Design a protein with these regions (language model features):
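Structured-RNA-binding interfaces characteristic of tRNA pseudouridine synthases
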Residues: 1-225
Length: 225
């Protein structure tokens, strides 16, 4: 399928009538959503479009499921990846008895009971700076696996459960594996007390399953100003 980057590139090329480069703030897996995403557009022509008009102009060329809502001019040597100091992900769970057709591919349908007390007891173990190797998809070739989680929380509102994780950076599938692990804590397959040794052990098989992509949203991007 088409990527968001490819669609942005196509729209920018049509808008500015010249080939444009797009660099995103991070990679997202297929099936994952973004409520906020930052990207740098390199426009090589001599644009006469004022920056505040770019979002509306871009949106006329973008498909219905992508929307630009803000733009600003940055220096030529601006590197988006170097300016990202953190990100927050949201994982959305529909915990109703029956599936919600409005949230097909937009939330994980989980009809079993979710034990919010058990989940809440598990959350503090993830906070702080740890080697999160156990929460990285096997086969990833990343040497440095230490990350700092600055905030992690779970909230219920009716049949929706929202899990938020903020960190200075994330490993491949890290949030989805954390969510899968929290589901297994709720199910009683793991306990909150197991988590320090799971984290310290660094073995992927000790952590929980990888939750499906459809519930995951890149929620906020924190940029150094």
């Amino acid at each position: 399928g088409n990527t968001v980057q490819a669609e942005l590139q196509k729209a920018a090329t049509r808008l500015f009538c010249t080939a444009c480069g797009i660099t995103g703030c991070s990679r997202t897996d297929s099936g994952v959503h973004a409520l906020e995403y930052a990207a740098v557009l390199e426009e090589h022509g001599t644009s006469v479009i004022p920056e505040e008009a770019v979002p509306r102009a871009m949106n006329t060329y973008l498909p219905q499921d992508i929307s630009v809502f803000r733009s600003e001019t940055v220096p030529d040597d601006f590197s988006i990846r170097r300016h990202v100091v953190g990100k927050e992900y949201l994982y959305l769970i529909w915990n109703g008895e029956h599936r919600n057709p409005f949230y097909t591919d937009r939330a994980l349908f989980y009809p079993r009971e979710l034990d919010m007390e058990k989940i809440s007891a598990a959350l503090p173990h993830f906070l702080g700076t740890h080697d999160f190797r156990a929460f990285m998809a096997s086969g990833s070739e990343i040497a440095e696996t230490t990350r700092t989680i600055t905030d992690i929380r779970a909230e219920r509102e009716g049949d929706f459960v929202r899990m938020f994780v903020s960190a200075d950076g994330f490993l491949y599938n890290m949030v989805r594996i954390i969510v899968g692990t929290l589901l297994e804590v709720s199910e009683g397959r793991l306990s909150a007390a197991d988590l320090p040794s799971v984290i310290a052990g660094g073995k992927r098989e000790s952590a929980g399953r990888t939750a499906p992509p459809e519930g995951l949203y890149l929620h906020r991007v924190f940029l150094r100003r």
